[in-house]
C-alpha cells in the first residue's frame, strides 16, 4: 500500500493485483480502492480468480510492471505479447520469481528488461533472512498458537530465507533440524549449530515443518506417512508446490478447518497433520 501511494503521489496511474491468492488484506485493498486506485484482488481467491485479476489489471496497458513471483510478467509474455512494446521495463521482488525470469532470459524469451530486486544486498541479506524469518514464525504462531520452545522444527533449505527461519526458531527455543541438498550449504548449517539430516529422517521426528526451497515436492506421501500425530506443515516459498497437497489429499480420511489458515487432516492411519495456509506462503 505504501508503494502504491508513493507511485500515485509521484504522478503515476496504478493498477494493482495480488501476487498470491491468500496474501491480500481486504481492508488495505478497500482503502486503496477508496482512494481511486484500480484494485483487482481479494483474500482467498482460487487459482482462476487469481489469474482473472492479473488479466483485468493488464487492461491498463502498463509501461512498468512490478512483480512478486513473476506471474504478471509470465502472463504478458505467454498471452499478451501485444503489450510488450509499451513496457519500458519491470522489477521482480522474490527469489522464486528471479529464478523463473533468469530461465526465460537464458532462453532468449524475456522481451523487456527486468530489475532483480531480490539481488540487492538490502533484500537478500536483510529482508530474506530477518524479514522472512520473523514473518514465517509469526504466521505459524497466528495460525496455531503453538509453543515453539522445545519443538523439533524442520527447515527444508538453508538459503537466506531458510537460514532466517532456522535462526528465529532457534531463538524461540526450538530444536532446529535442517534438510539441504547442497553439501557446502549443509556444512554451513552444521557449523551454525543446526542438526542436518534428510527429509526421510526428519519426517519421523519433526513437530513443525517449514519448506523454504523454491523447489517442488519437498514433502511428499512417504514423508506424511512417517510424521507423528499432530505434526504441523507449512511453506514459506512463493508457490504451493513444495508441500505436495495432492499426496496429502490421497492419505486423508477427513479434513476440517480448526483455525483461520489451519486445516486438520485426519489420515487413514489415524494420525493428524495440520496444514497451514493451504501450503501457500505462510
Regions inferred by a protein language model and the residue ranges of each:
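N-terminal ligand-binding/catalytic initiation module
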Residues: 1-121, 256, 260, 267-270, ...
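Short acidic, glycine/serine/threonine-rich loops at helix termini
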Residues: 3-4, 27-30, 52-53, 74-81, ...
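Rossmann-like adenosine-cofactor binding region
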Residues: 186, 190-271
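Generic secondary-structure signature for well-ordered alpha-helical cores
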Residues: 12, 37, 62-63, 70-74, ...
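Glycine-rich phosphate/diphosphate-binding loop of Rossmann-like nucleotide-binding domains
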Residues: 1-4, 8-11, 127, 131-205, ...
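Residues in the short beta-alpha loop(s) of Rossmann-like NAD(P)-binding domains
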Residues: 20, 181-182, 239
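Flexible loop/turn segments at secondary-structure boundaries
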Residues: 73-74, 122-124, 162-163, 185-186, ...
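Adenosine-phosphate binding glycine-rich loop
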Residues: 13-15, 43, 112-150, 245-282
Amino acid at each position: 500500500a505504501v508503494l502504491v501511494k508513493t507511485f500515485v503521489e509521484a504522478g503515476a496511474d496504478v493498477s494493482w493485483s495480488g501476487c498470491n491468492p491468500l496474501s491480500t488484506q481486504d481492508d488495505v485493498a478497500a482503502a486503496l480502492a477508496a482512494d481511486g486506485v484500480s484494485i483487482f484482488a481479494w483474500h482467498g481467491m482460487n487459482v482462476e480468480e487469481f489469474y482473472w485479476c492479473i488479466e483485468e489489471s493488464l487492461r491498463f496497458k502498463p509501461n512498468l510492471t512490478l512483480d512478486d513471483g513473476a506471474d504478471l510478467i509470465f502472463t504478458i509474455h505467454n498471452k499478451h505479447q501485444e503489450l510488450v512494446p509499451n513496457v519500458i521495463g519491470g522489477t521482480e521482488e522474490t527469489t522464486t520469481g528471479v529464478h523463473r525470469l533468469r530461465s526465460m532470459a537464458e532462453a532468449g524469451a524475456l522481451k523487456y528488461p527486468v530489475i532483480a530486486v531480490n539481488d540487492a544486498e538490502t533484500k537478500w541479506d536483510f529482508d530474506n533472512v530477518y524479514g522472512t524469518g520473523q514473518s514465517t514464525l509469526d504466521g505459524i504462531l497466528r495460525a496455531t498458537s503453538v509453543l515453539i520452545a522445545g519443538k523439533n522444527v524442520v527447515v527444508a533449505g538453508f538459503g537466506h530465507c531458510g537460514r532466517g527461519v532456522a535462526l528465529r526458531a532457534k531463538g524461540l527455543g526450538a530444536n532446529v533440524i535442517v534438510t539441504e541438498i547442497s553439501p557446502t550449504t549443509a556444512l554451513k548449517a552444521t557449523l551454525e549449530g543446526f542438526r542436518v539430516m534428510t527429509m526421510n529422517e526428519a519426517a519421523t521426528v519433526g513437530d513443525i515443518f517449514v519448506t523454504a526451497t523454491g523447489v517442488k515436492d519437498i514433502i511428499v506421501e512417504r514423508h506424511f506417512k512417517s510424521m507423528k500425530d499432530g505434526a504441523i506443515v507449512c511453506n514459506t516459498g512463493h508457490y504451493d508446490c513444495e508441500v505436495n497437497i495432492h499426496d496429502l489429499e490421497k492419505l486423508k480420511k477427513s479434513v476440517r478447518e480448526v483455525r483461520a489458515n489451519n486445516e486438520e487432516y485426519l489420515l487413514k492411519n489415524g494420525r493428524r497433520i495440520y496444514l497451514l495456509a493451504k501450503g501457500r506462503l505462510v
